[in-house]
Curated annotation (Swiss-Prot):
Gene responsible for this protein: ND4L
Gene3D superfamilies: 1.10.287.3510
Topological category with respect to the lipid bilayer: Multi-pass membrane protein
Protein name: NADH-ubiquinone oxidoreductase chain 4L
Catalytic activity field: a ubiquinone + NADH + 5 H(+)(in) = a ubiquinol + NAD(+) + 4 H(+)(out)
Native organism: Yarrowia lipolytica (strain CLIB 122 / E 150)
């Protein structure tokens, strides 16, 4: 019924329980943003407001930029140190 809320809660739990692996933490953060976007889009359609849809598009763009920058930083850190778990940092 409320798929956005379910995705948001499950990804938050995944983030809390998988804090050791940074890649999984990034994936959980991205799915949290997906859940927030689904909630925004649902409320935008429900209240017949276009600003929620526009804000969801902005969040999708920023999430793509954030994941590209984060992944490139992880690749550089892995090349430098050889480990990418959170205890190695």
């Amino acid at each position: 019924m409320f798929i956005g809320t379910i995705i948001l809660v499950l990804s938050f739990l995944g983030f809390v329980f998988n804090r050791r692996n940074i890649i999984l933490a990034f994936i959980c953060l991205e799915t949290m943003l997906l859940g927030i976007n689904l909630i925004l889009l649902r409320n935008s359609v429900l209240f017949d407001d276009i600003s929620g849809s526009l804000f969801a598009i902005v969040i999708i763009i920023l999430a793509g930029v954030e994941s590209a920058i984060g992944l490139s930083l992880l690749v550089s850190y892995y090349r430098l140190r050889g480990v990418i778990n959170s205890y190695g940092i």
